[in-house]
Every structure is written in C-alpha cells, then in structure tokens.
From Swiss-Prot:
Keywords: Coiled coil, Membrane, Transmembrane, Transmembrane helix. It is found in: Membrane. It is a single-pass membrane protein. The gene is Mettl25b. This is Methyltransferase-like protein 25B. One of its GO terms (cellular component) is membrane. The chain crosses the membrane at residues 406-426. It holds the Pfam family Methyltransf_32. Its main location: membrane. The keyword Transport does not apply. It comes from Mus musculus (Mouse). It comes from the Eukaryota. InterPro entries: Methyltranfer_dom, METTL25. Residues 185-209 form a coiled coil.
Amino acid sequence: MRGVSAHGLSHEERRQLAVDLTRVLAHYRSILDAYIIEFFTDSLWGTLPHSWQEALDGLNPPQLATLLLGMPRDGEEMRYRSVWPLTLLALKSTACALAFTRTPGFHTPSEFLENPSQSSRLTAPFRKHVKPKKQHEIRRLGELVKKLSDLTGCTQVVDVGSGQGHLSRFMSLGLGLMVKSLEGNQRLVKRAQHLDQELLKALDKMEKRHPKMVQRGPRHRPHHVVQWVSPTTLCEELLLPLERPGQSSARLLLTGLHACGDLSVALLRHFCCCPEVVALASVGCCYMKLSDPGSYPLSQWIAGLPGHELPYRLREGACHALEDYAERLHKAEPGLQTHCFRAALETVIRQVCPELRRPGVQGIPRVHELKIEEYVKQGLKRVGLDPQLPLDLAALQAHQAQENRVVAFFSLALLLAPLVETLILLDRMLYLQEQGFYAELLPIFSPELSPRNLVLVATKTPLGQAFSTLETEDN
C-alpha cells in the first residue's frame, strides 16, 4: 500500500492531515469499534451498507487481499468481478491516501536471501541468540542512530527498555558508540550482561583468526542499569553521563526499539524537558497500553479536534500486522477460520450465560483440524462452562458457512487500522513541533519483517539536507 510521507509535509499540512484523519475515523467508527468475536451476536455483517455486502459477499481470502486491501501478488492484475459502490472504493482510496507510508526508501536485495535465519549484513557474533526479525531491526535502527549521533554531536546513546540488550550490544560493540542501557527487569539485565561477555569472547577469537576482518580499537561494552522509566516523572539515572567528572557536558541521544505503550511517551517527555538530550530515535508499539488520558493526545492541536478520541479497541487494532495478514489471505491459510469459530462460540456463551461477554479464551491448538462443534466444546470448558451442553449443530454449521464474511469484515477493519497508527504518531510529531523542536517519521524496517516499522526522529536543531542520509541504506 502506498501512503503519505511525513517527511516533506509542512507544519500546516500535518495539522490538516490530523483534521482529515479524525473526520475519517469518526465516520467509520462503527467498523473500527466492532469486536470480530461479536460478528454473529451483534449481526455485524448487517451493519454494512447493502451495496458493500453485495460487493464483498463471496470473495475468497486471496481476492480480499488483492481487491480490498489493495495488496496483489507481484504481477497480479486487479480484476473486479462486479462494479464496486463508490462509497466502498472511497473507503479504500482514503485509507491508502491518509496513512503514513510503510515502505522504506531503500531498495537493496534482501539480507535473508541466502539464509532466512541469518542476516548477510551482520557478522556471525552479532547474529547469535538473535531472531531474524530482531537482526534486521537492530541493524537498521543501530545504523540510523549512529548517523544521527554523528550529525548531532552526541557523546552518549541511552537505550531505554533495552530488554536483553541486542540493540545496545550492536551499537556499542559493533558501531563503537558509548551506550547506556536501561531496563526495568533485573532478570533481563543479567541476561544482557551474560550475552555481552559471550560476544566479547567471540570477537576476540575472530580478531585472532582474522585480524584484518575485525575493526581494531577500544571496545566499549554497554553500561547496563536496572531502571524503570516513568512517563510522568524525570529519570535522573537516564541523564547521568558515562564520562568522568571534569569532561565536557554530555550530549545524549535517546532511543527505544519498540518501546511499549507509555515508555515511548516517556522518551518524548525526557527529550523535551532535558537540555542534555539533543536527539531522539524512537520506534513505538503496543498503542493499546497508552494511558488515557495522559499519553494521547499529547499535542494541543489534536486535543482540540472533535472526534480525536481513540478508545482501547481502536488502539489495539492499530497494532495488527497488515502485510502479514494479507500474506495469510493470499495463502488462504486454514487458521483464518479461527475468527469465525470464536464468533460462533460467543453465540453459545451468550445463550448459556448472557452476562458473560467476550471472555478470554486461551489459544486452542490446531483449530484448523477441529470440527466447529469440537472447538465450541473446548472453548466452553476454557471459560468455565459445561462442555457437554447440547449444541445446535445446524446453527453452528450455518455460522461456519459465513467464514468468508467474517474474514471480509475483519479485513475492512484492518484496512482502516493504519489510520489510527498514523494519528497517534502524527500527534507525537505535532507535540514535538509545538515545543519548538524538529520531528520526522521514517519507515525504517521492512514491514513484512517488522510491522511497527516507523521511527520517530527528533532533534533540537534542524538537520536540513543532512536528514536525507538517515533514509539511506549503508553499503
């Protein structure tokens, strides 16, 4: 899917985009607010315009990926079996036009062509214990942070919410940056320190075997600290420099790789409030965990717009992986029936216990191998109801026959979900600009590998033309 690039939009154009987004999201709120497990209990199919029902009814999953989501296979032509209503075409076009583009600006051969488990752009020691998705992420974000650090004259990088320290390790031992690594979980910090030691030994061995292949010079391992960072109060530890007293004052760059919920907001507030922090590179995630109010909206502009509210359901939907779901549709994966089965189970739960709504059902394994009545019995047991209740098999089979309708409705909601993410990230950019700073948003990861792939880059002085270097892929 194409979209709008945040980079290059003027401040006024960003404000107008916020106006357009709030209007569109308010117009389609009924689709975004719906829970797919209530497809049958709330007759969600009947809430769609009749002309939409006619256009979408009977489309199989691959057709939904191509025609509705607008994500055809390479070389595939988009052929509509009927004339779609203008209102549905308008929804599709609007969802595409107003969402921030998720396509990176670099065009290089895949780093996983030779081996799907090993990035060809990382040396073996940095790949150990790191999954392919994370290999891609730490390399791309680490290289951007290095460039941003050089451009802004930073003396220290602070990696907030660092987990097992994969990004910190690559930035310090791979790129030569001075890195402080903050993580609230002591167990993860101990694991990170163990992996640091393991990597140092591996690099020493590599240097002895291949002295010309390994960069010589001092190695700065990351400085790990067990520290919880609050979104509402300043963290003194975050601001403490690693340099010895007497040296020039530190210039800090804050970064966070998929900083969860309020943690992303904490990074923004530290950037705005602390003179020592001169740059920011943050990739957010888990928007449903944002405190409301407090973490959205942040900008005065969006707070003043009617319809700006984003309840939990909308923020949760913004965390789905559009590209991954489109691929599942193209493959017509058997697992697509899970939403239909769960919605059918909800009808039985409501009949037996009307006050029990949308209870959590722990993942039932191998759903695609079960008959719908078998799934329902297992589901009843998991929510504490009698699995031996007599079932209306004809009604369950009638629900199962509507599986493609369930998938179509879910696809509609997923088509709109990037607009919610766009509004959240746009709010953060406008907030930074309202404080007098400079903010841009870049698609940094391949969305097929990492769905939350937009990095918020902020500086306190304009980068000008130098900003374009952040978008390029290193050789």
